[in-house]
């Protein structure tokens, strides 16, 4: 009944729901494993997030109860730290951040500092991302914690990026380092692989299988396709190619039990080529292994053959995506979903 292209979280949930409703589903994935970008592998007794950090969080009770049918979650709270030229700041922007930056100790002092810088900038109609960010949080936070990180992420100067990329920058006037506001968060005990394996139990799965290598064959097998890859690739780029950004992950095993003391540290100066370092053992309790594994995350331009990780969010890309979405809305054969499909 269903061919599901992509064995990540969206594809796995689609397969589970199809099976539960009495439909037959076949899941294919060109990678040698299931789980998509949430896939983990174990090294040195440490569960490594192979494609970057993934922290599950939701305020939807139905979603939380659903995933807990398959796996329990630990009590990990995402509290990343930003490193700017060797000085550390808590994220998201909160009273700990403002104390480290200005020495202020009360919410009123912090709010006054931010408001003063916003008004000194005198930006009423931001023309680009830089002006938008400064108009929201002032020059100090922008220069130290937003500018370099954002420019590395998008591969462009902040003055060349559209203002609408940043709708808001969350500012908290409490000493709360919890990055998310959601009711529930955590990491699956046993890893995301355990969650995905539970979702795919009893479903036929074929890895190392490329949909586009024999598209006619795969399309002939099913009534509907659930597609979690690139929407423009599905339609043979007939309207043009969407622009994506890629990532490169550099994994390293170190002869120290604790490298940075936190799971995620962002490096916000432009001169450091990576955006963050992940120390995987801190995602789970314990962490008493004699060695540690870190991953440096490097943003990169997308080139054919590389992995597209996220779309470039500018006016051209958004307009082109809307054209592809209009095609999809008229297409009764396919359902798009997932990070790339949507």
For each of these PLM feature ranges, what is it?
Residues 44-120:
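Dinucleotide-binding Rossmann-like beta1-alpha1 core, especially the glycine-rich loop
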Residues 85-89, 95-224, 228, 235:
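Active-site/ligand-binding neighborhood in enzyme catalytic cores
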Residues 19-44:
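Glycine-rich FAD pyrophosphate-binding loop
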Residues 2-27:
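N-terminal Rossmann-like FAD-binding beta1-loop-alpha1 element of flavoenzymes
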Residues 6, 77, 205-210, 338:
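Short loop/edge segments at beta-strand edges and connector loops
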Residues 212-322, 327:
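Mid-domain catalytic core of redox enzymes
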Residues 9-10, 32-34, 96, 151, ...:
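Short, solvent-exposed loop/turn segments at secondary-structure junctions
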Residues 328-342:
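Short FAD-binding loop at a beta-strand-to-alpha-helix junction that anchors the flavin cofactor
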